[in-house]
């Protein structure tokens, strides 16, 4: 399961 750009973006929030 790879993380998408959005996934990483939300991870920062």
Curated annotation (Swiss-Prot):
InterPro entries in alphabetical order: Tachy_Neuro_lke_CS
Keywords: Amidation, Pyrrolidone carboxylic acid, Secreted
Expressing tissues: Expressed by the venom gland.
Methionine amide carried by residues: 13
Residues found modified as Pyrrolidone carboxylic acid: 1
GO CC, any one term: extracellular region
UniProt subcellular location: Secreted
Family: Belongs to the tachykinin family.
Name used for this protein in its record: Tachykinin-like peptide-XIII
Organism annotation: Phoneutria nigriventer (Brazilian armed spider)
Organism lineage string: Eukaryota, Metazoa, Ecdysozoa, Arthropoda, Chelicerata
């Amino acid at each position: 399961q790879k993380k998408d750009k959005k996934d990483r973006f939300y991870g920062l929030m």
